[in-house]
Amino acid sequence: MIQMQTNLDVADNSGARRVMCIKVIGGSKRRYATVGDVIVVSIKEAIPRGKVKKGDVMKAVVVRVRKDIRRADGSVIRFDRNAAVLINNQSEPIGTRIFGPVPRELRAKNHMKIISLAPEVL
């Protein structure tokens, strides 16, 4: 569960290392985001010569959360860290590579480009 002020790792090669959620998109009173949801983030830590720089405000898709993800078959999946992938206004990833596994739930939310770039889909 991601809410405002949550720090997330960045799971792509856009140049950002750490971001902070500043808004959960989807209604004025929407409080939490989970896997596949789009959030607005501020970049808190970035590498030199990256595509983004510290202080930029961007959109991101949440790809990993520490909170349990319950599936229809009763199984539960959980990750060690919260992570997101930066996207542009056309909902395409800014980076060209995705690091670490991503869950199948992204497919239902139509983030097919992220699924295809990911090394492992759980």
Curated annotation (Swiss-Prot):
Listed PROSITE patterns: RIBOSOMAL_L14 (PS00049)
Paired cysteines (S-S): none
Keywords, ordered alphabetically: Ribonucleoprotein, Ribosomal protein, RNA-binding, rRNA-binding
A biological process term (GO) from this entry: translation
Transmembrane segments: none
A Pfam short name: Ribosomal_L14
GO cellular component terms given for this protein: cytosolic large ribosomal subunit
InterPro entries: Ribosomal_uL14 (IPR000218), Ribosomal_uL14_bac-type (IPR005745), Ribosomal_uL14_CS (IPR019972), Ribosomal_uL14_sf (IPR036853)
GO MF, one annotated term: large ribosomal subunit rRNA binding
Family: Belongs to the universal ribosomal protein uL14 family.
Chain's role: Binds to 23S rRNA. Forms part of two intersubunit bridges in the 70S ribosome.
Complexes and interactors: Part of the 50S ribosomal subunit. Forms a cluster with proteins L3 and L19. In the 70S ribosome, L14 and L19 interact and together make contacts with the 16S rRNA in bridges B5 and B8.
Protein name: Large ribosomal subunit protein uL14
Organism phylogeny: Bacteria, Pseudomonadati, Pseudomonadota, Alphaproteobacteria, Hyphomicrobiales
